[in-house]
From Swiss-Prot:
Annotated positions binding Zn(2+) 2: D461, H524, E555, E569
Family matches, as SUPFAM superfamilies: Creatinase/aminopeptidase (SSF55920), Creatinase/prolidase N-terminal domain (SSF53092)
Keywords associated with the record: Aminopeptidase, Cell membrane, Glycoprotein, GPI-anchor, Hydrolase, Lipoprotein, Membrane, Metal-binding, Protease, Signal, Zinc
Covalent lipid sites (GPI-anchor amidated alanine): A650
Source lineage: Eukaryota, Metazoa, Chordata, Craniata, Vertebrata
Name of this protein: Xaa-Pro aminopeptidase 2
Native organism: Rattus norvegicus
Membrane topology per record: Lipid-anchor; GPI-anchor
Tissue specificity remark: Expressed strongly in lung, liver and heart, and at lower levels in kidney, testis, brain, spleen and skeletal muscle.
Length: 674
């Protein structure tokens, strides 16, 4: 899944309009977006009336002596996905996009979001709200300074601001004679009142031993060893990100959409383990698993989730040093630790250690990708049979592939909202259809599906782009060059400890050669039944260096404005490369096992090395997936796999019509049944 760090190109406004209402922006109509210039304003049926909500919030602001209140789009753990009861910005503004910041003053209210969501915001917000399209903190503060008089207060919830965000706001407001005030009671929650969704209370459970790479005791020992060997000699480490605690204790639940996490903090010290969580969610068996009935160094002491600030403050009053990873620590807990007792790093030791999978974790992740490939292949076969009938749309397609994954062993649902995008909608890297707004899949258009699953043994993420008709020469070239980029990076051999950003350009080279590019990241880490976007692995400037045992996605793409989109994403394991001469070098081993669309590959563009690599990959797919399909008696899917992994030849381009594929499939099945 391409991560959301697109540049804010103006053309995305038009693309958003297209995505919301096919066939194009001309059909969008003024009734589908708000028009605040008329009296009374004209609002679409999708707009949310926020008048009473704003009045309730402003009442709380007045009680706290605030002239402005900042409402970000995250939770107290800096999570990528947030639970319903944490959707504060969405509730107060009506705007449900995944990225954006709201600010409410005594008289005005405004939302800042990037170009992916401009049209959505105009559809969902009423005229109580201004929409701002420059999303920097500097832009937000400039607006605040224009609206808030000298000497007045700007409030924020310290548990919703990372340390870095707080520092940026504080710096921008310095010398402005406006005061940034930390209010630990969230005012939106108070205004929301009884209508706010409850905090999840599903059981927190321990993963069966066969699905874990190490015991929680072994992991605790590894973190303590890290602290002992640290030059700053920290006595404790504070874990704030939800996947950190889930990984450390091999515990899972379902508090967060698409992520098997539960609300918690961990304060791990050299002599104690303190888990801040809702204690009532543990069974007796899980309590015994955590050794909660003792106070020894390998016993877990359970404390109430809401007491994290007081608990950290009390521990920090002693002769201690606390290590934090500032990327996922909020100002709410950072603020109570005296600066002389802080040891700060970008990422916590848990983030660094879990990024490198041990041999058992590697085997588990690989196994999950085999089953996942079966589900994706079943989906592609289903599409080939049903798209010509005109019965498949983007939304029904997304529902079908999600269900195919749920049918697999050890499934725990999708790992993110499936991106099912046809034609011009695929030009939006993060487009997802809805039951109300979607397009039919067509033989005459490209179709992109980016999807993934959560399984007890691993998390998956894969993207394939297909065309069932006759693609244009440009579409074939663009697709092939995206494939070339995927191959070039996947087969690369590079020195150990190389940063991902150093090699990232290999995925773009084939596109750059002809003046093409893509605006999202090239890859991200992936977890063992954890995050689909697992930091700090990847190809960005702030990712850690590549190391043997890491898993990363490799996902170049190309997006033609208003016409089509292409992305080819595989998950790869970083392994030691076999080189002619001695040295420690690394390369990638793909663990995604679904063939690319032969109908879109221009073999003449591939170098001999690229073609050889592709055919070798296809042979690997046959070896890993073929037996599984045969074991399950999925004969139609097996025939499809055999056809789509036939070796490609430089002398003869391979394109196969739907009709010929159906005939071949029927003959293959008939021959097996005779």
């Amino acid at each position: 899944m391409a991560q959301a760090y697109w540049q804010c190109y103006p053309w995305l406004v038009l693309l958003c309009a297209c995505a919301w209402s096919y066939p194009g922006p001309e059909s969008l109509g003024r009734e589908d977006v708000r028009d605040c210039s008329t009296n009374p304003p004209r609002l679409p049926v999708t707009a949310v009336n926020t008048t009473m909500r704003l009045a309730a919030l402003r009442q709380q602001m007045e009680k706290s002596n605030l002239s402005a209140y900042i409402i970000p789009d995250t939770d107290a753990h800096m999570s990528e996905y947030i639970g319903k009861h944490d959707e504060r910005r969405a509730w107060i503004s009506g705007f449900t996009g995944s990225a954006g910041t709201a600010v409410v003053t005594k008289k005005k209210a405004a939302v800042w979001t990037d170009s992916r969501y401009w049209t959505q915001a105009e559809r969902q917000m009423d005229c109580n709200w201004e929409l701002h399209k420059e999303v920097s903190i500097s832009s937000i503060v400039a607006w605040i300074l224009a609206e808030v008089p000298d000497g007045e207060n700007v409030g924020f919830d310290p548990f919703l601001f990372s340390v870095g965000s707080w520092e940026n706001y504080d710096q921008e407001l310095q010398d402005s004679n406006r005061h940034l005030l930390s209010i630990t009671t969230n005012l939106v929650d108070v205004a929301w009142g009884s209508e706010r969704p409850p905090v999840p209370s599903q059981p927190i459970y321990a993963l069966p031993k066969e699905f874990t790479g190490s015991t929680w005791q072994e992991k605790v020992s590894a973190i303590r060893s890290y602290m002992q060997n640290h030059t700053m000699a920290p006595t404790g480490v504070l874990l704030s990100a939800l996947d950190e605690t889930a990984w450390l204790f091999n515990l899972r639940s379902s508090d967060i959409p698409y992520n098997p996490f539960f609300y918690s903090y961990t304060l791990l010290t050299d002599s104690s383990i303190r888990l801040f969580v809702n204690k009532s969610r543990f069974s007796l068996e899980t309590l015994q698993y955590l050794n909660t009935n003792c106070t020894l160094p390998m016993c877990v002491q359970l404390e109430d989730y809401s007491q994290i600030r007081d608990g950290v403050k009390a521990y920090a009053s002693g002769n201690v040093k606390i290590l934090i990873g500032i990327s996922y620590t909020t100002y709410g807990v950072y603020d109570v630790i005296p600066k002389e007792k802080l040891v700060t790093e970008t990422y916590s030791p848990v983030m660094l250690i879990k990024a490198v999978k041990n041999s058992k974790e590697q085997a588990l992740l690989k196994a999950s990708h085999v089953r996942d490939a079966v589900a994706v292949i079943q989906y592609l076969v289903w599409l080939e049979k049903n798209v010509p009938k005109g019965t498949v749309d983007e939304f029904s397609g997304a529902e079908h592939i999600d269900q195919l994954r749920r049918n697999e062993n050890f499934s725990s649902g999708p790992s993110f909202e499936t991106i099912s995008a046809s034609g011009l909608n695929a030009a939006l890297a993060h487009y997802s259809p809805t039951k109300e707004l979607h397009r039919k899949l067509s033989l005459d258009e490209m179709y992109l599906v980016d999807s993934g699953g959560q399984y007890w043994d691993g998390t998956t993420d894969i993207t394939r782009t297909v065309h069932w008709g006759t693609p244009t020469a440009f579409q074939k070239e663009a697709y092939t060059r995206v494939l070339m980029g995927n191959i070039d990076l996947s087969r690369l051999v590079f020195p150990a400890a190389t940063s991902g950003r150093v090699v990232e350009a290999f995925a773009r080279r084939a596109l750059w050669e002809v003046g093409l590019n893509y605006g999202h990241g090239t890859g991200h880490g992936i977890g063992n039944f954890l995050c689909v976007h697992e930091w700090p692995v990847g190809f960005q400037y702030n990712n850690m260096a590549m190391a043997k045992g890491m898993f990363t996605s490799i996902e170049p793409g190309y997006y033609q404005d208003g016409e089509f989109g292409i992305r080819l994403e595989d998950v790869a394991l970083v392994v030691e490369a076999k080189t002619k001469y001695p040295g420690t070098y690394l390369t990638f081993e793909l663990v995604s096992f679904v063939p690319y669309d032969r109908n879109l590959i221009d073999v003449s563009l591939l170098s001999p090395e690229q073609l050889q690599y592709l055919n070798r990959y296809y042979q690997t797919i046959r070896e890993n997936i073929g037996p599984e399909l045969q074991r399950r008696q999925l004969l139609e899917e097996f025939a499809w796999l055999e056809r789509h992994t036939e070796p490609l030849s430089a002398s003869a381009p391979h394109t196969t019509s739907l009709a010929s594929m159906w005939v071949a499939s029927a003959l293959a099945i008939l021959s097996w049944s005779c």
